[in-house]
C-alpha cells in the first residue's frame, strides 16, 4: 500500500475513513502469526528482527519505522473501521489514540430448503466433524493432519470441505472424507447431507472476523475454536460453541470432541442458541446501511 494517498487527501481536505481487515499496517506479514505462541509478541518490536529475516529474507528490523510511518498517516484519518473488538484492541495496543469503530460483517442466509434425504446419512452412526475452507498452516493444518490419524478406528469421522496446502490431505482415507472445493451457497446443504455435527475452526492467528464461522452458524452447526481473535470473541458472545486454550494438544482437542459427542443436551442448547442468533443476524444490506450512515456523517452535502 502506498501511503501517499493519506497525504494527498489531507492536502485537499478530503475526509478519510479507513477500513482494516488484517494487520498489514502493524506488520507486512499481515497475520501476526507465530507457530509457537499463535499470536506473535507484536508489542515488542525489538524482537521482530528474527521474524523479518525468516519471513522476508532481510537482515534489518524495519518494523519500528513501518509503524512510525503508518501511525503518522493513520492519525490523519477521521475514523478507522474494523470488524471485531479483538481486532480493535490489537490496533489500540499498537497505536494508542486512534478513533476506531467496530462494524461487524454482514452475511446473507442461503435461500432454499436443504436436502435431508441422503440415504447414507441415515445409515451413518458416526459422529461427523468438519474443517471448512482452505486450510493452511496458520488455519490449523497440523490439527487436521493429527486428527485424521487420531480418529482411525473410532466412531468419529473427519471431513474436509475445501482444500489444504498438504496434498496428502486431499484424498480419502479411513475415517476421513475429502470433499474438495465447494460453492459457497452449497455448503449448508453439503454439511447437512453429510450429517456434520461439529465444525473445527482451529485458526492459529487472531482472525479479524471469519466468514467460515458465519457459514457454520448459518448451517446451525456449533464450532470449536482456540481462545484467540474474532472467532473466539463471536463464539463466546453468543455461546455457540466451545473454546480451547491456545496451544491445546491433540489429546486436549480429541477429549473435547469426545465430550461434546457424549453430551447431547449441552449440544442441543448450543444449536438453540445458534437459531436464536440467526433470527437477528446482520445481513449484507444491514452492513451496507451502517457504512452509509458513517460515510454520510462526514460528507457535508
Regions found by a protein language model. Give the residues of each.
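Membrane-proximal helix-turn-helix segments that form the acceptor-binding/catalytic region
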Residues: 11, 41-79
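Conserved donor-binding/catalytic core segment of Leloir-type glycosyltransferases
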Residues: 81, 122-139, 145-148
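Nucleotide-activated donor-binding/catalytic signature segment of Leloir-type glycosyltransferases, i.e.
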Residues: 165-194
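Short hydrophobic beta-strand element within catalytic cores of glycosyltransferases
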Residues: 198-201, 222-225
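A charged, aromatic-enriched C-terminal amphipathic alpha-helix characteristic of glycosyltransferases
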Residues: 251-252, 265-296
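Conserved small/polar residues in nucleotide/adenosyl-binding loops
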Residues: 299-301
Amino acid at each position: 500500500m502506498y501511503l501517499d494517498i493519506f497525504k494527498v487527501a489531507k492536502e485537499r481536505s478530503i475526509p478519510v475513513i479507513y477500513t482494516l481487515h488484517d494487520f498489514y499496517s502493524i506488520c507486512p506479514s499481515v497475520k501476526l502469526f507465530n507457530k509457537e505462541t499463535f499470536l506473535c509478541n507484536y508489542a515488542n518490536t525489538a524482537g521482530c528482527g528474527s521474524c523479518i529475516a525468516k519471513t522476508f529474507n532481510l537482515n534489518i528490523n524495519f518494523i519500528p519505522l513501518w509503524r512510525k510511518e503508518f501511525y503518522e498517516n493513520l492519525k490523519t484519518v477521521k475514523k478507522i473501521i474494523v470488524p471485531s473488538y479483538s481486532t480493535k484492541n490489537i490496533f489500540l495496543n499498537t497505536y494508542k489514540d486512534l478513533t476506531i469503530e467496530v462494524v461487524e460483517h454482514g452475511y446473507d442466509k442461503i435461500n432454499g430448503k436443504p436436502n435431508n434425504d441422503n440415504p447414507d446419512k441415515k445409515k451413518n452412526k458416526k459422529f461427523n466433524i468438519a474443517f471448512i475452507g482452505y486450510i493452511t498452516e496458520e488455519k490449523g493444518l497440523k490439527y487436521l493432519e493429527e486428527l485424521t490419524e487420531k480418529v482411525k478406528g473410532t466412531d468419529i469421522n473427519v471431513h474436509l470441505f475445501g482444500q489444504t496446502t498438504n496434498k496428502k490431505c486431499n484424498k480419502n482415507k479411513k475415517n476421513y472424507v475429502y470433499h474438495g472445493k465447494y460453492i459457497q451457497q452449497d455448503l449448508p446443504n453439503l454439511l447437512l447431507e453429510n450429517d456434520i455435527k461439529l465444525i473445527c475452526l482451529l485458526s492459529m492467528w487472531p482472525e479479524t472476523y471469519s466468514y467460515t464461522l458465519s457459514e457454520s452458524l448459518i448451517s446451525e452447526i456449533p464450532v470449536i475454536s482456540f481462545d484467540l481473535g474474532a472467532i473466539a470473541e463471536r463464539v463466546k458472545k453468543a455461546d455457540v460453541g466451545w473454546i480451547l486454550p491456545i496451544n491445546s494438544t491433540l489429546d486436549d482437542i480429541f477429549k473435547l470432541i469426545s465430550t461434546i459427542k457424549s453430551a447431547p443436551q449441552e449440544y442441543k442448547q448450543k444449536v438453540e442458541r445458534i437459531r436464536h442468533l440467526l433470527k437477528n443476524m446482520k445481513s449484507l444490506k444491514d452492513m451496507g446501511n451502517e457504512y452509509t450512515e458513517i460515510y454520510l456523517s462526514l460528507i457535508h452535502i
